[in-house]
Amino acid sequence: MSTDQQGIWEENRKTWKMRAAALLLTAVCTVGASFAAYADDVPSGPASDMELIQRREQASGSQNEAGDAQTAAGSENHAGAAEGQQTTENQETGNNGQTASETQGTEQGDSQVPDGMVASGGRYIDPNAPMVALTFDDGPYAPVGNRIMDCAEQYGGRVTFYVVGNRVNSYKSEIQRMYANGHEIGNHTQDHKYLQKLGAQEIRQQVEACNQAVAAITGEAPKTVRLPGGGKNSTVLANISQPIVLWNVDTLDWKTRNAASSVQTVLNQVKDGSVVLMHELYNASGDAAVTIIPALVERGYQLVTVSELAQFRGGLAGGTVYYSFHK
């Protein structure tokens, strides 16, 4: 190689190095900017969690029926944190009026119902056998909800979904499936606002708007209400006429995001008449549910809705708070 050619090669090599360094610096800056933007989007509390979910769903086009097919990524920040902070209280019973869901019959006539069994939700329930209500808050969210329903139905069970009213139109087909297949749809307010912080009129509006949103799809309003975060005071209780159902087994799935932890909590704490709190927004909760369901059935538990559980444990009274339905 001549001296001139070697000089040209050296100049080109220096130019390539400079270009490579510039490209690397650009990439680092881009990643850093993206990380900073994401960091700014990290929720600072339960209320902002729900707003973040909605923004991400809107950005991905999930505010229509196509949203039923979206991936779970980006939807795993939610408004359930305060729900895990609600401490278990003694059950407040109220048997002075039964407002439980009417029993849904199977296609077979009453004459074909096995002795001692009750037809409900497309299958038979033994009123004298142990039963548990699995409940899932903050949905609907079809990628997880459909997995839960698939598994529950496979094992002859039904569950309860406490839905947020402003989400139901995004997942109409999931809501329709819940209703058609005998699962229960509960009211988790319209916007997941903490009702103990609101005035009487807005409390009533939050509950009624969710009732209307569900009824517009199914033709029937939810029968029970679950308070966001479990928060209540005298104003809340005075302005909700429906039965209020909280929980006595809390998986803390919003916090752990760990299926094994949720499974262990349920299997260690569950009893006949328990109401279990989980959340529909998390893949880990779906993973836990498909393990919990067969495990409970193997232990002899029937998986029933909240209203079914109440029906066989003394009924429900409007405006009364329930944590479980133990005998």
Describe each region flagged by the PLM:
Residues 107-198, 202-203, 213:
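Active-site beta->alpha N-cap acidic-glycine motif
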Residues 32-49:
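Sec-dependent signal peptide cleavage junction
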Residues 147, 180, 193-323:
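Catalytic domains of cell-wall/extracellular-matrix polysaccharide-remodeling enzymes
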